Amino acid sequence: ASGAITAGKPVIVNSNGTVAQVFENVDSATLAVSGSYTFESAAGSGALYVSICFDSVNNKIAIAYQDIGNSNKLTVAVGTVNTNGSITFGTPVLAYNASPTYFHIVYAGSGKVVIAYQDTSAGGGASKVGTISGNSVSFGSQSSDFTGNGNTIQGVYAAYDSNADRVVLAYKDANDGDDGVAVVGTVSGTSISYGSTTKFASSGIGTTWDLHFDSSNNKIVIAYSDGGNNYYGTCKVGTVSDTSISFGSAAVFESADSRAFAICFDSTNNKMIIAYKDTGNSNYATAVVGTVSGTSISYGTPAVFNSANTYEDHSIDHDSNAGKHVIVWSLQSGLTNKYAIGTVSGTSLSYTTSANLGDTAEQLDIVFDSNVNKFAVAYDNESSSNNGVARTIQLAYNNTTNNLTSENFIGFAKDAVADGASATLHTA
């Protein structure tokens, strides 16, 4: 016997021919929000604007931000989320020796991150590949201009297509009618190269947009406000092929001016969740379920998750362990940080009553750390000199597992058996 067996208990046969008692393991947790952990607090400084990602190879979070105490230069802090909900940060690392207004950091597979940003010296957009080691990161050389034409970008967001092993950037081209443009990047070692650009919106886009990878359908989904259609909330589905991306038709999910987009993939239900600010409904914080089929997307009915005027930012990610997602945002009045927990059922959404996260901020970003099954939320703490801080959120769950399958049950133990001893079984 492999392990002790109690008389009368069901028994399985292992692949090596030994037998073991059927066991049941219950793994559970209750909802918990941690205190704040500082990643940038030098005297007279702090963090402006933040972007966070999770490196699933090294089990680290990486936070990109503007360091107020160093002329707003682009900086990255790497941290470890611990099982007790605390976060341990290493020494921040300079990523770009200038102060870009627009930037985004994304996990790029194989223990790498990519940080994309506005090139303030040469124009256009640039990026670097970061390699994480411990609670630190080192960067390769700056890439060539990903716009291909030196045009000014006004915002850049990124997603990683794990099927194609490519990074997709989406940006606004300020020199070409504020059109929405996408480009595919290929990481090789510590460098990244880009293919040709593709427009996903040719009549201008609004001030925010977001994109995420649907791993069930191997598609990139971009949410944006369509300037050619009254800035309605819209999505397009993109397919990456080597160094290019193509898009299906535009699909409207909100027939009103929509802003502050955030999007994630719900791997429990194989759905996209899009959060946004609905200006047609008193600027309420709203979300909708999207179902991808081929290069098209259809929607359920939008659900309000906060009946108050929200600031120009939301962030969202999904907890694959608890099967739920969390949205974070700040209120327009007072910049109070809030969060809500969402559940998908078919194409419908339901939310818990929104709760205070703690502190105030103009901008927050959230990511799920699958190593410890907790969310990490980074923000500029308006309550404390814009210090860069992060908190963790642990969702409640109750998961039961056992070692019994439809094929390995062999019978019941006749007598109590010690570990390593022979067992006699009743098989009928």
Language-model-derived ranges and their functions:
Residues A1-V33, N398-A428:
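Surface-exposed, low-hydrophobicity beta-strand/loop segments enriched in small/polar/acidic residues
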Residues D27-N399:
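Extracellular, repeat-based ectodomains that mediate carbohydrate processing or recognition
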